[in-house]
Amino acid sequence: KEKMTVIDKIILTADEHHVMDIAHPSYWKNKRGEHPAPFTTISWWEVLSGEWIPFGDKDEVIDYLRRLIENEEYKHMIWPEHCLYGREGAAITPVLMEAVTCWAREGKYYEVVEKGLNPSTEFFGAFRANIPLEGDADTKFNMKLKDELESYDVIWLAGEAKSHCVANTLRQLFDYPEVVRRLVILEDCMSNISGCEDLAIPIYEKAARMGARFETLFRLLRSLFFLQY
């Protein structure tokens, strides 16, 4: 709040998922009618063999899982039901929203990028689904958002989870090095999903090679203090 006058724009992302989402347990059953436990990984050959039976069209699901591998996306993992459409869990964290609201009262506008409503594809990054789907423009790369980021000199990046949504947002910008070079990644304003600490290391290493900066919030605020005085 103390340094909010230096912020020109705040862009938040909000995940929203249906209960019957391809990454939720209810979407899947095995031959015994059991749902997978959270953090189970499912491959296309396990669907082909009948080990896991999807709620959606089997052939389309197999194609989706194959394309994850072909496009070097993360393995398909089952998560606990989260960010359910219309429920409290899909809302922006209240303490963050309070700070954003105070900032907006100074005559500024924030933006919320909603993602994840198509139940047939994961949507980690802010710009596109893990596998964009034909017939759903909302799953394809958000060029408007990328173009807006290009209008700013410095872009602070933070959020949850470091290993998944933040990392994939970063990776989806690798085709736009001029944006990556403007990024300041706030390392102490994010955390990994437990057990996935090493998953995104190559992404962050590549971002550093491309010119992204890594800072803590304390160092960032201290640098802003010296710039102002």
Q: Where in the sequence are the language-model features?
A:
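Active-site-adjacent betaalpha module
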Residues: 2-11, 17-229
